Amino acid sequence: MSSNSSLLVAVQLCYPNVNGSCVETLYSPGSRVILYIVFGFGAVLAVFGNLLVMISILHFKQLHSPTNFLVASLACADFLVGVTVMPFSMVRTVESCWYFGRSFCTFHTCCDVAFCYSSLFHLCFISIDRYIAVTDPLVYPTKFTVSVSGICISVSWILPLMYSGAVFYTGVYDDGLEELSDALNCIGGCQTVVNQNWVLIDCLSFFIPTFIMIILYGNIFLVARRQAKKIENTGSKTESSSESYKARVARRERKAAKTLGVTVVAFMISWLPYSIDSLIDAFMGFITPAYIYEICCWCAYYNSAMNPLIYALFYPWFRKAIKVIVTGQVLKNSSATMNLFSEHI
């Protein structure tokens, strides 16, 4: 972004005839087209990719499992980011102005925080689910049931929505920073200034679950490695049917854990720059240039578009489900009971 200044061609007001209007930074037509394509592609992928995930899991009975219900709910959170957050943030970033009103700015910010925290909660519960599944695959079905999954999903939605609504609709997030907030929030702007206390709470809310997930997945892969060695050592011996079944179940759960582990890592990488930037701004006087802030935001937003790509890369059943949905076979009465899995696990 060192060439950022070369992209700027003019400076004018967002609302030329209104006092207190924000300054609009205009980019060259070519740059604007490129930015709209890049951001628009992310929004479209987040909407339609996650919509495919939700339809796949909810329609095909073979995919009705506690883990997949969590994945579908996670896809719903990412879908809502693509619908309610990314399109409006795209216009704000490219036009450097907010044209949707002050009330919608608050709603947009609230949705941004709520749905992103909802994703984090879902991933944390998925990590716990995978830990139980890999460490004790035969007992797992009795521990992590559909009702338990439903409780996890409810918590993953209710707490973030309550937290986000309470913080942004009461105005407590900028206590002590009212002058700075008034200066930044000119007419045509939608910049949320958060004080140190709330930034610290936000960062702890990100780093603590992240640390828990790292520990869980670290243990998962240690257990998976031990299981793989055990299977390898007993491979030449005659296995009983129960031992063979346990090996197949363990192999399947390890594969699922690997895929969902990639999803967790992608989330961490996407959100880490934004979390660090928030800390720097809160404790060093909001020194981050606007374009750095926008890059951090869009790295985080793009995470909502990544998960469907990860599923398509690692899950053959998801690729098959997409084919069935796109070709219209999903409209057949028998499609819900279709076999999406290969014979070999």
UniProtKB/Swiss-Prot annotation:
Example of a GO MF term: trace-amine receptor activity
Alphabetized SMART domains for the sequence: 7TM_GPCR_Srsx
Superkingdom of source: Eukaryota
Extracellular side of membrane: 1-32, 90-107, 169-202, 277-282
Annotated protein name in UniProt: Trace amine-associated receptor 6
Entry keyword set: Cell membrane, Disulfide bond, G-protein coupled receptor, Glycoprotein, Membrane, Receptor, Transducer, Transmembrane, Transmembrane helix
Membrane-topology descriptor: Multi-pass membrane protein
Cellular component GO terms, alphabetical: plasma membrane
Regions of this protein lying in the Cytoplasmic compartment: 54-68, 129-147, 224-259, 303-345
Function: Olfactory receptor specific for trace amines, such as beta-phenylethylamine (beta-PEA). Trace amine compounds are enriched in animal body fluids and act on trace amine-associated receptors (TAARs) to elicit both intraspecific and interspecific innate behaviors. Beta-PEA-binding causes a conformation change that triggers signaling via G(s)-class of G alpha proteins (GNAL or GNAS).
Localization terms from the record: Cell membrane
Positions annotated with a glycan in the UniProt record: N4, N19
Notes on the domains: In addition to the well known disulfide bond common to G-protein coupled receptor 1 family, trace amine-associated receptors (TAARs) contain an unique disulfide bond (Cys-22-Cys-186) connecting the N-terminus to the extracellular Loop 2 (ECL2), which is required for agonist-induced receptor activation.
Lineage, uppermost ranks: Eukaryota, Metazoa, Chordata, Craniata, Vertebrata
Transmembrane segments: 33-53, 69-89, 108-128, 148-168, 203-223, 260-276, 283-302
Main subcellular location of this protein, as a coarse class: membrane
Disulfide bridge partners, by residue number: C22-C186, C105-C190
Biological process per Gene Ontology, one example term: G protein-coupled receptor signaling pathway
Family of the protein in this entry: Belongs to the G-protein coupled receptor 1 family.
